[in-house]
Amino acid sequence: MEEAEKYLLKGIELCERLNEKGWNTIAHSYLAVTYFEMGNFPKSKDYYEKVCGLLEHTRLMPSSLGLAKIGAARSRVMNNEKHVDLESLYAHSRNNKIKTIEGENSKYIGEILLNIDDQHISEAEHWIQKAIEADQRNRMMFYLGKDYALYAELFKRKGDRLKARENLGKAIEIFKECGADGWVEKYEKELAIIL
């Protein structure tokens, strides 16, 4: 992840020098995701908010703006900032017009619901299932692997170790098919702990 961070920061620097808006926005988006995966939720939130600013300024890609707003909320929740306007997040998901991010929207909302408190577990499960269905339908295999990994986390929280192992196993198989060796290694370690 550190290598990704380095190259994305360099890409952002070059885009800003060239005043290149499109690739700059994409680089900011991937940097927000990278920081999230690194567990640096404040930086992830900051970069998602920068993406929102860039997209609001250009008034292009409202569906991507919705995903960035959901991503920022997810980073806030993981940073223990629990006040989130769930209805606005649901509206962003409903208003999405890009099939390839349909599952990501649902997964992010599922992750928010799973981590905001203990009262939204069944809603989180519904949104994670929606993410799985969307990513299967749209053939977004890497994201499908992430969906199953999150589903495994939900079952761990519910105390269902068998279903947690089953879903983590599905995630690992998908990551193997994608050639995502780092993710295979990460989740194989998690699977060994669930034993």
What are these regions (language model features)?
Residues 1-195:
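Helix-coil-helix junctions within alpha-helical repeat/solenoid scaffolds
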